[in-house]
Amino acid sequence: MKEIKVIIAGPRGRMGHEAVLLMERTEHFNLVAAVDYKHGGEKISDLPGMPALHAPIYADLHTCLDEVEADVLLDLTTPEVGKQHVTLAVERGLRSVIGTTGFTEEELTRLTENAKEKAVGTIIAPNFAIGAVLMMKFSQMAAKYFQDVEVIELHHDQKLDAPSGTAVKTVELIRQNRESKQQGHPNEVEQLAGARGANVDGIHIHSVRLPGLIAHQEVMFGGDGQMLTVRHDSFNRASFMSGVKLSIETVMNLDHLVYGLENIID
């Protein structure tokens, strides 16, 4: 396979560290630079626990793109920084794979239009774990037969956004096979604000943040005399790397934006 030159934004995070290791062990991936505002001017190998890769680190993406030739930006930063980075990547005509979440429908619409206009491949993935993508697809299938559903997502206590992008994407897929319906008793009253969780078109999402967790989600369907639960668990961040690898390889052949890995797997 042809070499793919990659820039990683956010190499010091746990996902970023796993992605650097992915670069090291994948023959056709070449890590040409990284972006980290705290370590501009250093090299990847200077960071604690990193392999002996000598890709330069830039403090900002603008400077990096001015000085480095790359095929793909892999962004594993924070929601706000990720939004800035993907916008800049599209403007510069650079393919990108975005692992941050928190995009609004309006932001996705604007990015989709811009990527189409520039004919630049872009993948935004709420979750890179293949099992999580299948969990979302199975939930979408089940919604055709079970109209009563709630989502419980559980993540580590350092996660910045709630609900998770995976939960929001799951609900979006379920809505495609489910008529709008308010879940629960029509006259129910919350004795404490937020007791029933977030409400998206009548579907409740409950967010848990605790140390010891990584990324987990249950989609619970209820029917007459039965329950169906679709669950996925990521026990470490290595679980996301197969999806990262697939996304980097796939985005090379795209000329538009794709939201969600379910749209690129068979």
Swiss-Prot record:
S-S pairs: none
InterPro entries (alphabetical): DapB_C (IPR022663), DapB_N (IPR000846), DapB_N_CS (IPR022664), DHDPR_bac (IPR023940), NAD(P)-bd_dom_sf (IPR036291)
Keyword Flavoprotein: no
Enzyme class (EC, first level): oxidoreductase
Gene Ontology MF, one: NAD binding
Residues noted as binding NAD(+) in the record, renumbered to the chain: G10, P11, R12, G13, R14, M15, G99, T100, T101, A125, P126, N127, F128
Active-site residues, as the UniProt record annotates them: H155, K159
HAMAP family linked to this entry: DapB
Name listed for the protein in its UniProt record: 4-hydroxy-tetrahydrodipicolinate reductase
Source organism of this protein record: Bacillus cereus (strain ATCC 14579 / DSM 31 / CCUG 7414 / JCM 2152 / NBRC 15305 / NCIMB 9373 / NCTC 2599 / NRRL B-3711)
UniProt gene name: dapB
